[in-house]
Amino acid sequence: MVVSFLKELLNFRSITPDDAGSLEFIAKFLPDFEAKFIEKNGTKNLILSKIYGDGEHLAFAGHVDVVPPGDGWDSEPFTPLEKDGYIYARGSQDMKSGVAAFVCAAKEAKFEGKLSLILTSDEEGDGTYGTPLALEYLREIRDLPKFCVVAEPTCDKKFGDSIKVGRRGSINGKIVIKGVQGHVAYPEKCINPVNLIAPLLSKIADHDMDGGSEFFSPSKIVVTDIRGGMQVCNVTPSELSIMFNVRNSNLTDVNDVESYLRSVLDGLSYELSIKQSSKRFLTNKDSKIVRNLMASVTKITGVTPLLNTKGGTSDARHFAEFGVDAIEFGVINDRIHAKNERVSISEVNKLYEVFKDLIENFY
């Protein structure tokens, strides 16, 4: 059932933030669940919920939107192709396989509490009208889940090898070094910002702000762009700009990064802009959702998953901000956002079994 459902879901050309009708399709697939659509500026979110008993409130979450397919595919990106044990289509790994797995598990599994499915079509883009709107609604009606599994593709080499219990934060910034433009033949009459930053760049690029912790790697300043001048050989630039990103751990915050950079740049004429684009989060490894999902993964796959926080940001951070114990688990992520994206059919079936086992044994 889950594979056929996934194929139908992959047919929807749901390029972010357009769900292309996929959310209605999912809602109709689960007629026993109460459906609540939350829409703003043409962007849709869907909350499906069902009360089975007096037990705890468990949720699954995911996004149906995908990035544009781009060129160079060997098949039509929105016509799923089954070949050699894989399904090829845009969104097959990221993350319609995860959505299909928990939707089908919710349809078949028995539960003792309240089960919710929280879906958005605004994750791959800005996310302005996505998951946070759905969570704000649930908070207003006092119906936030206690636990949530976000079915992002998390596994690395082998299905079952990785559960994300957190994510690093993301800090973006820009440094502008001020100089005085002039003729290269008269360097004594110029203040070249390239010369100013050259001896300091090694203190910025790839600098570790901390030594990392149990679940987080060090917070490293990564320079992403350096530019200045007019692309000519006989004029020194009036300024030079450096853009950077820091994926920060629990040991470093935006103020730490700003203070460090200002100490390095002390004495120069410069401007610094910096902001926390997304917050880091970490769910306690002893949380019930972590322990139970680990048990289900090991039971179904025979693999003991590693708890980690690797990778970029995801919507799990929003759940954490609302006080929900959130973790992530899904298929292998070796083809996400790539041409000829594909997912293993075996992994899809196993993911469905993991989620079904988690639901039925969540007590």
UniProtKB/Swiss-Prot annotation:
Keyword NADP attached: no
One Pfam family here: M20_dimer
Gene Ontology MF terms: acetylornithine deacetylase activity; metal ion binding; succinyl-diaminopimelate desuccinylase activity
Binding of Zn(2+) 2, residues: 94, 124, 337
Cofactor detail note: Binds 2 Zn(2+) or Co(2+) ions per subunit.
Source domain of life: Bacteria
Keyword match Metal-binding: yes
Reactions catalysed: N-succinyl-(2S,6S)-2,6-diaminopimelate + H2O = (2S,6S)-2,6-diaminopimelate + succinate
Residues forming the catalytic site: 65, 123
UniProt keyword annotations, A-Z: Amino-acid biosynthesis, Cobalt, Diaminopimelate biosynthesis, Hydrolase, Lysine biosynthesis, Metal-binding, Zinc
Obligatory cofactor(s): Zn(2+); Co(2+)
InterPro entries linked to this entry: ArgE/DapE_CS, Bact_exopeptidase_dim_dom, DapE_proteobac, Peptidase_M20, Peptidase_M20_dimer, Peptidase_M20A
UniProt pathway: Amino-acid biosynthesis; L-lysine biosynthesis via DAP pathway; LL-2,6-diaminopimelate from (S)-tetrahydrodipicolinate (succinylase route): step 3/3
PROSITE patterns per record: ARGE_DAPE_CPG2_1, ARGE_DAPE_CPG2_2
HAMAP family: DapE
Family statement: Belongs to the peptidase M20A family. DapE subfamily.
Subunit and partners: Homodimer.
Function of the molecule: Catalyzes the hydrolysis of N-succinyl-L,L-diaminopimelic acid (SDAP), forming succinate and LL-2,6-diaminopimelate (DAP), an intermediate involved in the bacterial biosynthesis of lysine and meso-diaminopimelic acid, an essential component of bacterial cell walls.
Protein name: Succinyl-diaminopimelate desuccinylase
Annotated source species: Campylobacter concisus (strain 13826)
Taxonomic classification: Bacteria, Pseudomonadati, Campylobacterota, Epsilonproteobacteria, Campylobacterales
